[in-house]
Design a protein with these regions (language model features):
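Metal- or metallocofactor-binding catalytic centers and their adjacent structured scaffolds
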Residues: 9, 39-118
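Hydrophobic faces of well-ordered beta-strands that scaffold small-molecule active sites
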Residues: 48, 135-141, 164-166, 193-197, ...
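Glycine-rich, aromatic-flanked loop segments that form ligand/cofactor-binding clefts
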Residues: 106-142
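Metal-dependent enolase-superfamily TIM-barrel catalytic cores that perform enediolate-based chemistry
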Residues: 128-240
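Shared catalytic-loop signature of beta/alpha-barrel
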Residues: 211, 217, 228-243, 250-346
Length: 370
């Protein structure tokens, strides 16, 4: 049988969340995903996932748009290739479509999974080999009222989590910082704490806010100003008493080059979807390491498919500030046969071929949007 690629399909599914997850501009009660399946003539199927954190507010791509882009443009571009690998497929997609990193990442992920299954190797092994069997998880807390969020933080602390991320930006900076400070008081001094306004502050507010966050015991501030304003980020980094973590300011390889040259951040949050795929996220990591910028494994609130892809990449990094792959634990259900495993606040990196997880076709049919 031929190993040539025969089809690429994209299916939208909607999964409810275990509790509302408040972000800077929206509150999630469910998560929508695009499941990609790349089928080859020899019977192998590679799987990928397109996912945005709560809709198009973050990067501009919607779940519906991701599916339309894959069906109408990206899949036809890849299927024209004789034997598409992740790299050659990305080049083909770039020729036909500008931007759209989340859609491209979903297709590329499926091809990495297919390549790993054919070789009998995990994606981490294909990338050079894993450095870590487990990854430390920073638990993502919702941007909701302090008492409710504090109770959740204390519960997760008892489960073994040693890192916590405070979502911010939904209310004015003053009361928001007071809310975070009240929650922080419930946690011991030795846990990692990250505050994320999602670029909601102007530079003046951020300068005052970072000092206030430091006084409350927060160790890291993620993207306090708009992603485009790398100059302000650099100025804040030069004066801030806490570590500055770039996210929206680091969406492309070119962004990463600018950050490394300007030393605009202490750390960078890398995400497979926002980078446009595993290969480009890996390239960004290489640039960050060369520039002395620490790596933080970011999340787009993915299922076990997206979490497995990111974990495969993150496990190859020699040093990792933290990792935020909490998506599977925020979802009521998953769409793989055996979901990603978590133990004592750490994620166990799958060791099987490709992504190391297998799609549950019955659940895909059940949760598929009609």
């Amino acid at each position: 049988m031929s190993a040539a690629l025969e089809s690429i399909t994209a299916t939208i599914i909607d999964l409810p969340t275990r509790r509302p997850h408040g972000l800077a501009t929206t509150t999630m009660g469910s998560q929508s995903l695009v499941i990609v399946q790349a089928r080859s003539g020899d019977g192998l199927v590679g799987i990928g996932e397109g996912v945005t954190p709560g809709g198009p507010w973050w990067g501009g791509e919607s779940i519906e748009g991701i599916k339309l882009m894959i069906d109408g443009y990206l899949a036809p571009a890849v299927l024209k290739l004789d034997n598409p690998y992740p790299g050659t497929a990305m080049h083909a997609m770039d020729r036909y479509v500008a931007g759209n990193p989340f859609a491209k990442a979903a297709v590329e992920m499926a091809l990495w999974d297919l390549l790993g299954k054919r070789a009998g190797l995990s994606i981490a092994q294909l990338l050079g080999g894993p450095e870590h069997a487990t990854l430390p998880i920073t638990w993502a807390l919702s941007a909701e009222d302090a008492p409710k969020v504090a109770d959740e933080a204390v519960t997760k602390l008892a489960e073994g989590y040693r890192g916590f991320k405070f979502k911010m930006g939904a209310i004015d900076a003053g009361p928001d910082i007071a809310r975070v400070a009240a929650i922080r008081q419930k946690l011991p001094d030795d846990v990692l704490t990250v505050a994320d306004p999602n670029g909601a502050w102007d530079e003046h507010t951020a300068r005052l806010g970072l000092h206030a966050l430091a006084e409350s015991g927060i160790a890291v501030a993620e993207q306090p100003v708009s992603g485009w304003n790398k100059d302000a980020l650099a100025r804040l980094r030069g004066s801030a008493p806490i570590r500055v973590l770039a996210d929206e300011s680091a969406q492309t390889v070119q962004d990463m080059m600018i950050l490394a040259r300007s030393t605009s951040a202490d750390s960078v949050s890398l995400k497979v979807p926002k980078a446009g795929g595993i290969s480009r996220a890996a390239a960004m990591a290489t640039i960050a390491i060369a520039g002395g910028i620490d790596l933080y494994g970011g999340s787009t609130l993915e299922s076990s498919i997206g979490a497995a892809a990111s974990a495969q990449l993150f496990s190859t990094w020699p040093r990792l500030l933290a990792c935020e792959l909490v998506g599977p634990q925020l979802l009521v259900d998953d769409i793989v046969v055996e979901p990603i495993r978590y133990r004592d606040g750490r994620l166990e990196v799958p060791t099987g071929p490709g992504l190391g997880v297998d799609l549950d076709q019955e659940k895909v049919r059940f949760y598929a949007r009609h």
